[in-house]
Amino acid sequence: MQLIDSHTHIYGEEFDEDRDEMLARATEAGVGQMVLPNVDVASYPRVLELCAAHPERLFPTIGLHPTYVKEDYISQLDYMERELSQRPHVAIGEIGLDYYWDTTHQREQIEAFERQLHWAAKLDIPVILHIREAFADAFETLRRVNLPQLRGVFHSFTGTREELEEALSFPSFYVGINGVVTFKNSTLKEHVASIPLERLLLETDAPYLAPVPKRGKRNEPAFLPHTASFVASCYELTDDTLITKTSENARRLFALPKY
């Protein structure tokens, strides 16, 4: 079973010089399909172009990342809502709340988050959630919108044990784990194995957060086996067992075709 990178930004300019080689390295490393979340209107055409070139391997999502919620957020959302009807997307994302860098637009972030959650519910596709320093508001928003059919993933999860327990209280949501779990100062390794295996996804979030022993380098999908191996050790499982299960999970959540 090949690995599925459930969250990667390989359409970014960081890969413009060696994108084909990077994809070849991913293949060699056993990484097959990948989900490509966009972050704003400007990034969306790049996502579409790359996915169109590899339609059985790369899959687009659409959404407004919380740190891109600025004064023009309504016009960005209007554009994305129009695009939703033009082609299929495997998810709405990445969306959510991020109070780490800037708290100027908290109200607008919540409004954008709610609107996009309703898109996903209406279209019956999952959401990819980016939550940073904002779990209380995110959980409150998810409960307030009260959309029973909503499903998705808490991407790049780095929260506390208590936040993990609350995330898992949403029964149709998975938890995405990336290279952060391998970092020496990460406490995530202490409780990652409490995530039920049937609700675990693996991701790179490339070009960010390269796992040990590649930390400090530009991250890429070929590095995903390092994270997989580390997480497998936390569960006391073989790499193959963990890879098989997480790939099945990703294929089920995003309705990916066999590859």
What are these regions (language model features)?
Residues 1-259:
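Mid-domain alpha/beta scaffold segments of enzyme catalytic cores
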